[in-house]
Amino acid sequence: MLHKLLVMAALMASPAAATGLKIEVEGEANGVIEIDLAEDVAPGHVEQITALAEEGAYDGVVFHRVIEGFMAQTGDVQFGKMGGDMRRAGTGKSERPNLSAEFSDVSFERGVVGMARSADPDSANSQFFIMFAPAPHLDGQYTVVGRVTSGMDVVDAIKRGDGRSGAVTGQPDMMKSVTVTD
């Protein structure tokens, strides 16, 4: 219990030296989302995300799967670029290796950012999702990489997908630019 409280406190704190992401969103949602990354909880995943952001790999990537009351997923740097074949969005990854799971005691609550993966727990790569609401069934099953500290109003405005799959049709919202912050 104490460990869980310490991890949650670390995620909620905003120390000046913490690594984060600044995501400029464009589409139905317009604005900036700021995320504090949890280097102490998932160091390997945070390293990969920040490297991809620094390379510009996330720039122009759409929110391809957005489920009302659950989460908004993005980060397919292979097939999820605006202007690409959106039927393939969500099936790609980066050229970097997949990551071993870094599960923790951190709960998937509103604003928590987690890594997307296939059925294999060690298959996370570049895709991530932001929670609209708590999802305790994900706890201990997916890697938590951070928490939104500013811009949940922007997250809430992201264009929703259709039905249970959450596949976004038409013109999806996108991450116009993603930069690493200190």
Task: Provide a role label for each language-model segment.
Residues L2-M8, P15-D182:
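Cyclophilin-like peptidyl-prolyl cis-trans isomerases
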